[in-house]
Amino acid sequence: MWEPYMPVEPGLGREENFLSLEDLLMSQEKLPCCIESGFPRLGFLDKGGDSDSIPEGSKMELPLWLAKGLYDNKRRVLSVELPKIYREGWRTVFSADANVVDLHKMGPHYYGFGSQLLNFDSPENPEIAKTILQTFVGRFRRIMDSSQNAYNEDTSGLVARLDELERSLFRAGQRGLNAFQSWERGKAAQITASNLVQNYKKRKFNEADA
């Protein structure tokens, strides 16, 4: 099938891939911040203010890419407040049963955005990282089982609740199932490795060369 652009995989962990459309969209998501040092002549960033500067102590939401660019742990230019889905209350919900949460409604880039939060110095970072990993592990099996066992069924209800990373995994699982079904019917000459496996091998090869 023809695609309007060549898909590029999102970055891994705290690294972003600015050739990835998904990472670009994620970097536009807003992050609640508190200004620790006044910003002269940047009042236009605060749509609710009427000053040409942003005074110290102001609270505002900044795009992730801008918050990362301004953040400096030594100078304390700004501090970051955790979005509610990454706070302790929601971490408790995820640890109880991550499958009940509508991740797309809470944050379409839950895993990627949460990984980016680790760039900011927070005492809760270890717990955030732990919850993100446990959530992924807890939901992964159900997602892949559904992608393999819902052949020709309506999966829109399930997919609507998935984070963007989970949606890509679900689609990869269905593509693999379709390829296997075609192979069984003799419509494919051979089974090839999935794009995820091929990209992983390329990354490992490049790391070995480096």
Curated annotation (Swiss-Prot):
<dbReference type="GO" id="GO:0071162">
    <property type="term" value="C:CMG complex"/>
</dbReference>
<comment type="similarity">
    <text>Belongs to the GINS3/PSF3 family.</text>
</comment>
<dbReference type="Pfam" id="PF05916">
    <property type="entry name" value="Sld5"/>
</dbReference>
<keyword id="KW-0158">Chromosome</keyword>
<dbReference type="InterPro" id="IPR055221">
    <property type="entry name" value="PSF3_N"/>
</dbReference>
<comment type="function">
    <text>Required for correct functioning of the GINS complex, a complex that plays an essential role in the initiation of DNA replication, and progression of DNA replication forks. GINS complex is a core component of CDC45-MCM-GINS (CMG) helicase, the molecular machine that unwinds template DNA during replication, and around which the replisome is built.</text>
</comment>
<protein>
    <recommendedName>
        <fullName>DNA replication complex GINS protein PSF3</fullName>
    </recommendedName>
</protein>
<dbReference type="Pfam" id="PF22466">
    <property type="entry name" value="PSF3_N"/>
</dbReference>
<dbReference type="GO" id="GO:0006260">
    <property type="term" value="P:DNA replication"/>
</dbReference>
<comment type="subunit">
    <text>Component of the GINS complex which is a heterotetramer of gins1/psf1, gins2/psf2, gins3/psf3 and gins4/sld5. Component of the CMG helicase complex, composed of the mcm2-7 complex, the GINS complex and cdc45.</text>
</comment>
<dbReference type="InterPro" id="IPR010492">
    <property type="entry name" value="GINS_Psf3"/>
</dbReference>
<dbReference type="InterPro" id="IPR021151">
    <property type="entry name" value="GINS_A"/>
</dbReference>
<dbReference type="InterPro" id="IPR036224">
    <property type="entry name" value="GINS_bundle-like_dom_sf"/>
</dbReference>
<keyword id="KW-0539">Nucleus</keyword>
<dbReference type="GO" id="GO:0003682">
    <property type="term" value="F:chromatin binding"/>
</dbReference>
<dbReference type="InterPro" id="IPR038437">
    <property type="entry name" value="GINS_Psf3_sf"/>
</dbReference>
<dbReference type="GO" id="GO:0000811">
    <property type="term" value="C:GINS complex"/>
</dbReference>
<keyword id="KW-0235">DNA replication</keyword>
<dbReference type="GO" id="GO:1902975">
    <property type="term" value="P:mitotic DNA replication initiation"/>
</dbReference>
